């Protein structure tokens, strides 16, 4: 597969990346890439969970950039955030929580703070680290 690959994330034998505005998976023992999403909108900054079972990513399927999660085996994505704010990047996993950069509660757009949300859903919690 030739193309322009962006935002690679690696966990053990799995590599997930963005190409053609979708998520793709390659396992080290199988060089064939598998398309995980077929969205009409753009996806970015995927991040595999520490156990390799989940992929958190930024998507704009419903308009705003929001946090989504899906199984690394494929299947449907679940939208986790409904904040209506700009999410720019999935930064890290912390146990069951996904840490991400957002302009939620900022008076000016594109000024980001770190926030977290549980992979099972729930409210977004702003982290008190200042501007990210």
Each language-model region and where it sits:
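A flexible loop/linker signature enriched in serine peptidases of the S9 family
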Residues: 18-24, 38-43, 56-68, 76, ...
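Blade-terminus and WD-like Trp-Asp/Gly-His loop motifs, strongest in beta-propeller folds
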Residues: 7-12, 45-54, 89-98
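Beta-strand-rich domains and repeat architectures in extracellular enzymes and scaffolds
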Residues: 1-28, 44-46
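Residue-level detector of functional hotspots within protein domains
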Residues: 1, 9, 32, 53, ...
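Cysteine-rich, disulfide-stabilized extracellular repeat modules
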Residues: 11, 32, 51, 76, ...
């Amino acid at each position: 597969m030739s193309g322009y690959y962006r935002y690679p994330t690696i966990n053990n034998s799995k590599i997930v990346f963005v190409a053609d505005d979708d998520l793709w998976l390659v396992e080290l023992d199988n060089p064939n890439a598998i398309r995980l999403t077929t969205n009409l909108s753009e996806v970015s900054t995927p991040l595999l969970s520490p156990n390799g079972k989940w992929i958190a990513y930024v998507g704009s399927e419903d308009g705003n950039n929001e946090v989504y999660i899906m199984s690394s085996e494929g299947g449907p994505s679940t939208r986790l955030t409904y904040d209506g704010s700009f999410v720019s990047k999935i930064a890290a996993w912390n146990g069951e929580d996904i840490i991400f950069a957002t302009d939620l509660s900022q008076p000016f757009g594109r000024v980001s703070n770190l926030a977290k949300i549980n992979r099972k859903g729930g409210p977004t919690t702003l982290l008190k680290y200042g501007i990210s």
